[in-house]
Amino acid sequence: MSFTLAIVGRPNVGKSTLFNRLVGKKLALVDDQPGVTRDLREGEARLGDLRFTVIDSAGLEDATDNSLEGRMRRLTERAVEMADVCLFLIDARAGVTPTDEVFAEILRKKSAHVILAANKSEGSAADAGVLEAYGLGLGEPIRMSGEHGEGLNDLYSELLPVSEKFEKLAEETAPETDVVLDEDENEAFNAGEEIAATPVPTLEKPLQVAVVGRPNAGKSTLINKILGEDRLLTGPEAGITRDAISLKIDWSGTPMRIFDTAGMRKKAKVQEKLEKLSVSDGLRAVKFAEVVVVLLDAAIPFEQQDLRIADLAEREGRAVVIAVNKWDIEDEKQEKLKALKEAFERLLPQLRGAPLVTVSAKTGRGLDRLHAAIMKAHDVWNRRVPTAALNRWLAGMLEQHPPPAPQGKRIKLRYMTQAKTRPPGFVVMCSHPDKMPASYNRYLVNGLREDFDMPGTPIRLTLRGQGDKNPYKGKKKSTPSRLRKHLEGRKS
């Protein structure tokens, strides 16, 4: 496995800027406001030929109470404990501050390997701050500029001996979606007339799950309960998680990567620039996930923003699980559950049959049901149906309810096959596909859900005409050139 590097330092010394440079993507929020990064955040970093995990920590604040700064400080200490190496950043232009000295002492006690770096050291104005850094007792500081990429060669030299102690870890990739089925594999599968097994999550390719919802729905509390440790910031302040945090866990024997996203508010309420960045981060987490857990607040479920989040996940083609949190404080549970199911079917018909489970992130009740629902949704998302079974089913559907004949043109549905998985995608060859009403499409999709046990997952149904394979269909004939017109004119 690769080593882990934690970037630590007081607020606004350039930790997130360096994190983004190492990761190669804008994965951490960057702003001039101190304390922008409020959670521990992991990414796969590249530095030359080195590959390692980097943690962007909350800014070290000299606070010990239960304030947000105090919790940030405790999380940073947790990052130091998790890491193999700590990169301690100071601001060379500001020089060594009393806060830097306090936390240099903490790092000496808690971390076996500390690399000291004087960031923002471009130009002669930083020389005095670099010299002051020697007084911290952490060795010779590296002169760096995370913004301009200076000092990375020196950082490489420091990390190379560490890297040699660890095996290289293969870079993680985004989950495969809209997987086109191989024709040869399809033939073998169809001959067996069996539903293919769902790919089993592994440590190298864990099941990727995004937990999304409105602010303060309990997303971080839920994940902390699954983890069994206080990894993410939790508290009464709405919108406390501003980044989409990715965590690898083993949940009941299933390797998973879980994304805890920023609470998605209505656009009208997203005033602060940072929160706008976080909402887009949450949308991106949905795209990275295979299964999306939409977490609702039992007291105010299915608000407009909840519906938009669930619809977004469906449009992105992800498996969806609806989880209703704070169930422990509900009094009339049976009546409430009945009302929730009725509202779900009425407000989100496109997710008909998706799992709806009740949980309490505070007490941990219902987590086993949530795990089972995620695994079921993932299984359905990967579902494959034999072509022969599809065409027998199609014949029955046509007999039960023949397609309409718009403008007197009879639509013939001739053949059906599955073209994709993740989510399931089907193709029907027919005449006049452009004339097929949307209501008949829904009839077929709902039938697929019920008859092949595919509740809740997005199902893509494409109608194709007989001539769709003709590459010249719809192309204009080439017009005669001027030379050709001239020659034909001379002949006449």
Curated annotation (Swiss-Prot):
Residues 3-167, 207-382 form the EngA-type G domain. It holds the Pfam family KH_dom-like. GTP 1 binds at residues 9-16, 56-60, 119-122. Transmembrane segments: none annotated. One of its GO terms (molecular function) is GTP binding. Residues 461-492 are annotated as: Disordered. Residues 472-492 have a biased composition (Basic residues). Keywords: GTP-binding, Nucleotide-binding, Repeat, Ribosome biogenesis. CDD domains: EngA1, EngA2. InterPro entries: G_ENGA, GTP-bd, GTPase_Der, KH_dom-like, KH_dom-like_a/b, P-loop_NTPase, Small_GTP-bd. GTP 2 binds at residues 213-220, 260-264, 325-328. The keyword Nucleotide-binding applies. GO terms for biological process: ribosome biogenesis. Residues 383-469 form the KH-like domain. Associates with the 50S ribosomal subunit. GTPase that plays an essential role in the late steps of ribosome biogenesis. HAMAP family: GTPase_Der. Belongs to the TRAFAC class TrmE-Era-EngA-EngB-Septin-like GTPase superfamily. EngA (Der) GTPase family. This is GTPase Der. It comes from Ruegeria sp. (strain TM1040). The gene is der.
